[in-house]
Amino acid sequence: MRNLSQLLDLHKDLDEIFFAHQSALLHFEFKAALSLLERYEYGLLTHIRDEEDVLLPVYSERAEIVKGGKPQFFLDEHFKLKEFVKLLKKEITKLPEEPNLDSKLIWLLDKESFFKRLCNHHDKRETEILYPELDRITTEAEKTELLSRVTCAFSSSKAV
C-alpha cells in the first residue's frame, strides 16, 4: 500500500540541500551557495506546484477541514516560501561586492534562520494535517493516480 505521505520524504532532501547551501555560505563560496539555493528552489517550486495542482484540489473538495488546515493556509505559506527564496537569491548575488561582508552575511543567515522556521512550521502542518487527511480520503487507485501525476522526487540521501 502506497501513501501520499511518502511525498514528505522530499522535505528531508530539501533540508539537505539547504544545509549544503548554508555550509557554502559559511565558507564564502558564494557561487556554490547560489547554485545550491537554485537547486533547492527548483525542488521547492516543483513540490509546491505538485501540491497546488494535484493534491490541494482533492483536499479542498473532500477533506474534513480542521483548525489550521484551511487550504488557503497552505497556499499562503507557499507564497511566503517562494518570496523568501527570491529574496535570499537576490541578496546572495550581492555578497561578492559587499564592503561590509561580515555584517551582511550575518544578516543573511538571520533571514535564512527565519525562513527555516517558516519551513518547519509549514512542514509540520503538512505532516500533521494535509498528508494524513489526503491518505484518509483517497482510495488506493486514487493514490496511485495522484502519485503518477506528481513530478518532483529526489532520491532520498542523494539530494546533494
How does the language model describe each region?
Residues 1-160:
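Small-residue-biased structural context
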